[in-house]
Amino acid sequence: MVVLDSKLPLDETLVINADDVRSYRTSRLAGGTVLTREEALLLALMSSENRAAYTLGRNYPGGVPAFVDAMNRKAKELGMDHSHFADPTGLLSENVASAEDLTRMLSAAYQYKMIREFSTWPDLTMVIAKRPQKFLNTNRLVRSGDMNIGLQKTGFINAAGKCLVMQARVNNTPLLLVFLDSVGTQSRFADAVRVRDWYERMPGGAHPIRRLM
């Protein structure tokens, strides 16, 4: 949201530099990779590419510190009173958010057409260092088409475990789903399917327990 709110040109070229590579080693974006801001946003949302996310922050006016400040201001505007952001990627354990705050963020992010589209993009092939590289959406439910998902993001650090947040439409009702600290790699996705199935079986017709949208 901060990237899009900034109105910075989406076709501006950004370069993955040595600092990005040194800070985030698990990435297929090699040093020297050239991306547009739009491509970096797509890879960050779809494939959880941390170098892409960090590069977006580094190329924000004022750099990463200003970007993080903007993230925290945005959170405050949204009423996320139990959240704090420490870096653009979410990989630092100092990044914290409550489940309810994450629903607030989901509701706000859903208003951005590009975030909806990019976060639910199944896969993408890009030429990186003169070689085609295929990037997959980190949410297997998006790739399989098992659910009607309007927005989603996966995440993982040791302190938080496997996490998943998403907006999905079940029985023509938009639901905000938050799964934190899932035990296994696939359990968060299986839990989402279980919630969908349970909701569809509710007697007397489906109705939201708590309407958040």
Report residues per predicted region:
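Active-site-adjacent loops and short helices of periplasmic peptidoglycan-processing enzymes
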Residues: 1-100, 109-113
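Penicillin-recognizing serine hydrolase domain
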Residues: 63-213
